[in-house]
């Protein structure tokens, strides 16, 4: 019997699987140093983004789906 595939720890912290099956991610650059960025940039980086079709297959594999 083949052992079960483990979920990638880094991937489960970074990606979420939506109900429709697409993979969402947060935008980079939203951890600290906001005083050096304009409010416009900060607003643009909020919210979630979808992983591209080329990368979503790999992301799903890392999530064990």
Swiss-Prot record:
SUPFAM superfamilies: L35p-like. Residues 1-39 are annotated as: Disordered. InterPro entries: Ribosomal_bL35, Ribosomal_bL35-like, Ribosomal_bL35_CS, Ribosomal_bL35_sf. It comes from the Bacteria. It holds the Pfam family Ribosomal_L35p. GO terms for biological process: translation. Residues 1-16 have a biased composition (Basic residues). The keyword Ribosomal protein applies. Keywords: Ribonucleoprotein, Ribosomal protein. GO terms for molecular function: structural constituent of ribosome. GO terms for cellular component: cytosolic large ribosomal subunit. Belongs to the bacterial ribosomal protein bL35 family. This is Large ribosomal subunit protein bL35.
